[in-house]
């Protein structure tokens, strides 16, 4: 006899799932039947929010959906924040939960873990939520989820399985096989029109986002063909290498970059929703695209949001970029206007770098020092000062090396569990498994501090760089700037070194660049996590000497 839970595990294996994140509970034990005999590794967080963040980090690095097993009720309310972050950033996540038996759904009888409507609860943070009313539906609904991940705009999917369905005898479903879907190609007529507009442009510019991560090579070739400066969103860092002459970084919120965008006569936006946290991080407004806007996105709805285009193409970013290249290579291009291209991009970069203040320079030195010690590291960030700085000043050599929760939903506590997931997904990055660095502040770390124990247990050697500024400094600045007397921001901070060591984690505090470099190299030799604490005030003093 094979139960629904056992068939689920078999089907997940067939879809290439290698990791599952979850906390077993009385309602989910049947999800685990057969898991020990499978090839799937299970990682246990200390909170379901941690499971979701781990799945998120795993997906961002590996490109595969992160999968969670979650218990009815409190498990689902706990994971919704992580689903919200993944939804906002278009991250593939499969959340499989239990739910009350079919004859008790919505009954309001006070059953253990009961919610009036669990599926409705997560409806706003999931592409869809499906209640499995029969085990026979399982292959079809999994196929629907993976079709979305493979060919649509990837976002969290929730499948809830009633307790009585989980134990159904479904031997016949053992023969079920995965379904593979390819992304849509580019419509030839739209490609022709878009190619003609790009070919006639005298000042073309490209805005590329996380939706184009897998098109890095094509994007680079397209930019070089057009001589177009390229601005990347925060999650798209590394799509052009850091020293590429056409790269203008992720500085779309700054006046000088906005002026360059305003000069462009044709702007190609590919895989980006043109949203506030990438194009207006100071919330000042004023990002304008007066030139002809061309948009490429896998989601038709997204092509007309925020900034309506002159022309839109609904297609996979890589396929569309290749089609445009083929068209551009077959026709003459308009002469570029003045110094537009590498020279104009270089002038902008020089202007920006000359304007960084002392704090920005000190935090950029911190990030550069980490990268010098760990050249191919993956940086997983929280909402914290060095991350805000790096979002503006930091560029990397390859994609999927920089992402954080300061974009989109903007939650705190993300970075530590997401870094655990990122390390587990890192084996698929090539160039050997890279080091994974968690950038997090003292306030954010206290949201998910117990996940250090998860990292120890899972033997994931993540390097936690704790930037300690003694509370919620960014919010304190907002209060002061608005003439509000600061309240609730000067929080108590514990002995992080002592807590980390008590959880089984190596930990130390450092002063200056030399100690940071030595601590990072020592961390790379360990089999488990390391916490390195950097006191903000002390760092500023040390590097200014």
Q: PLM features: what roles do these ranges have?
A:
Residues 1-332, 369, 433, 461-464:
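N-terminal alpha/beta PP-like core and its mobile active-site loop of ThDP/TPP-dependent enzymes
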Residues 8, 23-26, 31-36, 342-430:
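Active-site diphosphate/adenylate-binding microenvironment
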Residues 27, 50-51, 78, 118, ...:
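Catalytic-loop motifs flanking and including active-site residues across diverse enzymes
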Residues 28, 48-53, 386-388, 512-516:
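Short acidic loop-to-helix transition motifs that present clustered carboxylates
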Residues 104-113, 261, 304-306, 312-314, ...:
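Thiamine diphosphate
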Residues 124-131, 177, 344-359, 503:
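Short glycine/proline- and acidic residue-enriched helix-loop micro-motifs
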Residues 136, 290-383, 511-545:
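Phosphate/pyrophosphate-binding active-site segments
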Residues 151, 374-375, 456-461:
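Basic phosphate/pyrophosphate-binding loop/patch that engages nucleotide-derived ligands
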